[in-house]
Amino acid sequence: MTKKLYLPLLMAMVVALFSSCSKKMGELSADYFTVTPQVLEAVGGKVPATINGKFPEKYFNKKAVVEVTPVLKWNGGEAKGQPATFQGEKVEGNDQTISYKMGGSYTMKTSFDYVPEMAKSELYLEFKATIGKKVVTIPAVKVADGVISTSELVNNTLGNANPALGEDAFQRIIKEKHDANIMFLIQQANIRSSELKTAKEFNKEVANVNEAANKKISNIEVSAYASPDGGVSLNTTLAENREGNTTKMLSKDLKKAKIDAPIDAKYTAQDWEGFQELVSKSNIQDKELILRVLSMYQDPAQREQEIKNISSVYKTLSDEILPQLRRSRLTLNYEIIGKSDEEIAKLASSNPSELNVEELLYAATLTNDPAKQEAIYTQATKQFPNDYRAFNNLGKLAYQAGNVDKAESYFKKAASVNASPEVNMNLGLISLIKGDKAAAETYFGKAAGTKELGESMGNLYIAQGQYERAVNSFGDSKTNSAALAQILAKDYNKAKNTLANVERPDAYTDYLMAVLGARTNNSSMVTSSLKSAVAKDPSLAKKAATDLEFAKYFTNADFMSIAK
């Protein structure tokens, strides 16, 4: 009787034991898991998450091995993260051991490559468990929602970026000058008949400039000099007389030619600067010694004496250098006045061959009509095919029109002519908008000196998830991307100011303002801005309907009437 009762009792205990073990390795509550961030967010093209999990007390079978895999799921797809494996106390292995009695905590870091479908997704933990050779089923646990993808808007705001312009070097007024020298004999100030030919040729140039319709005389300078030999007192009188005689002659000639031009006259008693310049350019013996004397002594008399002491070269100086310093220099300063804006604009459309490359490129800046600008730049590529700027600027127009492939073609053509910093920067923008961050960074590295480089680097930093650095790089730039960086860096006041001053606002300007409204709890800003965005780009309604930036508005009737 006792044996009959004992056997069924033993079997019942075994069944109960296995039943108990199975329950302990069963479903885990979501309360045992926390995820940072609570709502997953795309950063630099990735969706990172830190998962803190816990196996409760008396749960983890001593012979169990459990593999935990983060899985991000969305409608029609999923992405798996790196799994982690845990083992019970009686398992021989190298994985983290979890105590049956005390349970155990663990931390997992995971990251998924972002795809747009993840905007409406859920993060699960999936379990693969065995006890010995027996497979144990542990249901998957949902631990987070995702994905806030605001950073990925950089792929859209890039279209609002400013490509670098190949700027013209047009100058309406170009300053020019014409020089002539009236030479004098040693210790003389009279103008010799042999020098009158020089004066006559100079006066002829003055007359030509005066008569030219596109030239204007500024003034004529008379600068008279004496060579350093002979003492300060003598040379002062000598230089003054040379200046006086030259000015008198020039004034007489101008009056005779009926030319009204101001004369600015001055004299230099001892032309040590001219002496030093001529010696430096010469091949005379002991040149370095002479130059050293000039640097060591400032007193004119001492300089002259020390140089005379270098007897080996003084005769050469007297014969070759000093005579060139006994002169009056005549300088005609005048301006070449270029075509007016009206003339350039008219010729650009009617007879562009009359314009040089700088004038033609400048003509494109006189209109805000992209079609007219394109026509001008196209003409420039025909007239000046070896100038990269027109090709580059056609690429800029195509980029701003949203035609990335056409822009790339023009930028590559420009690069084949001249791989300038501007062209490299623009090719970097193309690479960035096509998702090749490494190539973009390489191109930007060759774009030093371009005005727009800070803005372009700001876009790259957003794409890399470096938001504070992006804000600094944008500076005071007023673009959608600059505002996006400020939103991501949580500088909402600055972002609002930036969006209000975007030069070429578009649908994404309004969409970012709606995001800003959601982040600052301004419901009227959300609805009004989103309504404006959808009016410009209807596809943004569908995006807003699943954008977790607006999660708390998904039950708002006004919001849902727009995002439908």
Give a label for each model feature.
Residues 2-513, 517-546, 552, 560-564:
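N-terminal targeting segments with Sec-dependent signals, encompassing both cleavable signal peptides
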